[in-house]
Structures are given as structure tokens and as C-alpha cells.
């Protein structure tokens, strides 16, 4: 058994496969995810686990180049959750964010119920 960091085996494997410029999503409980996109579903009940808990655990393990959130998140908690953790944050409409989902490596679904708690994360390199 691992003694620290991510414990979910599917999430560990997915994170280990990420390369420079590849993207993944940390999503709220309601984001419609295309059937062809791999989903790591961590949701237990509505509200658990929270977006920030999952986001922080993943960010401890990956190098991040930037992120994309929905315009609709601006001025609300999801924007601050992302901007507090990632320097380069772009915005697109929620519809455009959903249209980008088929191109991500995977989606991590949380139990978060705060609207627009979704972020596309772009991986960097540690050198």
C-alpha cells in the first residue's frame, strides 16, 4: 500500500501516463461527459468528495502549464479555487469547455455541487 499521495489505482495510473501538453479535467458531479472519454468517478454522494480536495491531491502529483475554466465561473468559488492554485488560467464559454472534452486524456468526476466547478488542466514538464 502507498503511504502518501494519490491512492485510487485508476487515478494513479492515469496521472502516471500524462505527458507534456496533455490535458485532463477535474469535474463537478453534473458535467456531461462524452461516452468515449475515460472517467475516474470518485463521487460518493452529492457534495463528496469536494472539488478542492481532489484538485489539490492531483496537483501535488502533476506539473501544470495552465488551465481553462468556464466564463460562467468568473466571480464565483470555482474561479478562485483554480486561480489560487494555477497561474495561467484561460476562460471559454461553458459550451466550449464541454466541446473540448473529447480531446482530454480523462475526466475525474467529484461529488462537487457548486455550479461550473470544472477545470481543464494542461500538463507541463518539470525541467
Swiss-Prot record:
One of its GO terms (molecular function) is D-ribose pyranase activity. Its main location: cytoplasm. One of its GO terms (cellular component) is cytosol. The active site is at residue 20. Pathway: Carbohydrate metabolism; D-ribose degradation; D-ribose 5-phosphate from beta-D-ribopyranose: step 1/2. It comes from the Bacteria. Pfam families: RbsD_FucU. Homodecamer. Catalyzes the interconversion of beta-pyran and beta-furan forms of D-ribose. This is D-ribose pyranase.
Amino acid at each position: 500500500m502507498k503511504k502518501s499521495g494519490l491512492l485510487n489505482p485508476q487515478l494513479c495510473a492515469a496521472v502516471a501516463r500524462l505527458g507534456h501538453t496533455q490535458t485532463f479535467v477535474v469535474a463537478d458531479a453534473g458535467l456531461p461527459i462524452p461516452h468515449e472519454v475515460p472517467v475516474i468517478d470518485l463521487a460518493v454522494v452529492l457534495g463528496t468528495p469536494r472539488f478542492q480536495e481532489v484538485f489539490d491531491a492531483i496537483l501535488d502529483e502533476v506539473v501544470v502549464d495552465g488551465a481553462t475554466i468556464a466564463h460562467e465561473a468568473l466571480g464565483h468559488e470555482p474561479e478562485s479555487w483554480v486561480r489560487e492554485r494555477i497561474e495561467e488560467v484561460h476562460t471559454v464559454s461553458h459550451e466550449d469547455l464541454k466541446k473540448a472534452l473529447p480531446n482530454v486524456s480523462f475526466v475525474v468526476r467529484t461529488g462537487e455541487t457548486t455550479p461550473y466547478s470544472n477545470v481543464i488542466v494542461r500538463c507541463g514538464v518539470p525541467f
